[in-house]
């Protein structure tokens, strides 16, 4: 028989989260079925629609972004560390790197006060830059902490094109309403800024956002036609709003690592050895005490003062932190799931407003009881907006 080891993405979102993934790969290698149909290992099945699909990827209309002239970077989880320690050093993948001294933060298209792992610490670090600029349609925690907020349009206030690599559909997304208040498209905001910096023509090429959309699509139309793929011209797409392209994305015989299994010398993996590495000499040479050159078990951090273990899954009623305003219409607080035995031991009941805390911070939540939650474990979905009082 065949065995597929299916691993949830969530395992990495913990201290030493690399190890369970690595060990799962080792186990799959020991079973000897990597590269066979129905065998091996997979990640994130059921998370999004195209995971595990035996399909090619479609290349839709794209905007040429050029090359970023700045090669330096930091891991995204180290934003607070960087702001709090300008010029300080840190370890990353065996390298000793140095934090830059950031004077200005310009944030467009994200919300760090949702996805950062320690919001109280980020809140402190956010005071260090001289200027923070944010594009936002909503009055988020990030926008509230900016020096300058450029009100940006939503997808309903601008035109665009939509497509996905694993889907044969392409959409024209027409502007539905006029921009609310002083809101502008991100492109128009940057266009006006480029004018202030005397480089507007270089940035815009004298084209509006709608003209860019048409030109990008026309280039895609020509490339598709040259490849024998028939797609609608731009004006027809605008009339129909969407199209299912005449391209067959199915590829029934696709098996991950099939070619590697057949001929590992001709089709090496992207590891230093080109093989599945149960032991990694490269990682061993990093000389990190808790990360040897092989997957290992590290005891979880436990504190007798905080006996409950918190899980933070994705919410069923929001997309990450989006749509929070709609949730607040029915419940102003996040919901904490707890086993009835743990609730009885603490004298609390379903629907109670409770305070949750540890050494890093605290929050309020509405209690919900579930027999399916293990005793000693509680669950509160991610996505509630950061809104601390004077005590944090």
Q: What is each of the regions a protein language model found here?
A:
Residues 64-180, 215-392:
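A cross-kingdom feature strongest in bacterial/archaeal respiratory oxidoreductases
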Residues 31-38, 146, 153, 197-201:
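A generic secondary-structure signal for well-formed alpha-helical elements
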Residues 6-15, 174-180, 202:
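Short, solvent-exposed helix-loop connector elements
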Residues 4-10, 37-44, 204-208, 232-237, ...:
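Short coil/turn segments at secondary-structure boundaries
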Residues 176-191:
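Alpha-amylase-like alpha-glycosidases and glucanotransferases acting on alpha-linked glucans and related
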């Amino acid at each position: 028989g065949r065995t597929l080891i299916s691993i949830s993405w969530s395992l990495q979102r913990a201290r030493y989260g690399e190890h369970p993934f690595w060990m799962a790969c080792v186990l799959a290698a020991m079973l000897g079925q990597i590269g066979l149909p129905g065998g091996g290992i997979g990640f994130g099945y059921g998370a999004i629609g195209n995971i595990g699909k035996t399909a090619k990827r479609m290349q839709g209309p794209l905007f040429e972004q050029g090359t970023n002239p700045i090669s330096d970077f930091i891991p995204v989880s180290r934003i607070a560390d960087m702001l709090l320690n300008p010029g300080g050093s840190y370890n990353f993948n065996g390298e000793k790197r140095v934090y830059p001294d950031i004077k200005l933060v310009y944030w467009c298209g994200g919300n760090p006060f949702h996805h950062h792992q320690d919001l109280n610490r980020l809140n402190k670090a956010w005071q260090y830059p001289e200027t923070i600029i944010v594009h936002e349609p909503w009055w988020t925690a990030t926008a509230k902490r900016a020096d300058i907020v450029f009100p940006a349009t939503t997808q309903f206030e601008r035109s665009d094109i939509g497509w996905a690599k694993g889907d044969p559909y392409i959409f024209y997304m027409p502007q539905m309403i006029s921009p609310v208040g002083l809101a502008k498209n991100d492109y128009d905001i940057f266009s006006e800024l480029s004018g202030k910096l005397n480089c507007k023509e270089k940035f815009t090429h004298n084209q509006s956002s709608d003209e860019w959309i048409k030109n990008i699509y026309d280039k895609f139309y020509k490339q598709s036609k040259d490849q024998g793929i028939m797609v609608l011209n731009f004006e027809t797409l605008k009339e129909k709003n969407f199209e299912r392209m005449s391209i067959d994305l199915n590829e029934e015989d696709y098996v991950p690592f099939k070619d590697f299994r057949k001929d590992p010398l001709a089709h090496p993996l992207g590891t230093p050895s080109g093989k599945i590495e149960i032991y990694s000499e490269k990682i061993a040479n990093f000389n990190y005490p808790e990360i040897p050159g092989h997957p290992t078990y590290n005891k979880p951090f436990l504190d007798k003062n905080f006996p409950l273990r918190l899980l933070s899954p994705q919410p069923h009623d929001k997309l990450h932190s989006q749509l929070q305003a709609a949730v607040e219409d029915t419940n102003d607080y996040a919901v904490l799931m707890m086993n009835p035995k743990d609730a009885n031991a603490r004298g609390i009941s379903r629907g109670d407003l409770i305070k949750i805390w540890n050494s890093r911070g605290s929050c309020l939540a509405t209690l919900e009881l579930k027999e399916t939650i293990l005793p000693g474990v509680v669950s509160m979905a991610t996505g509630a907006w950061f809104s601390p009082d004077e005590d944090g």
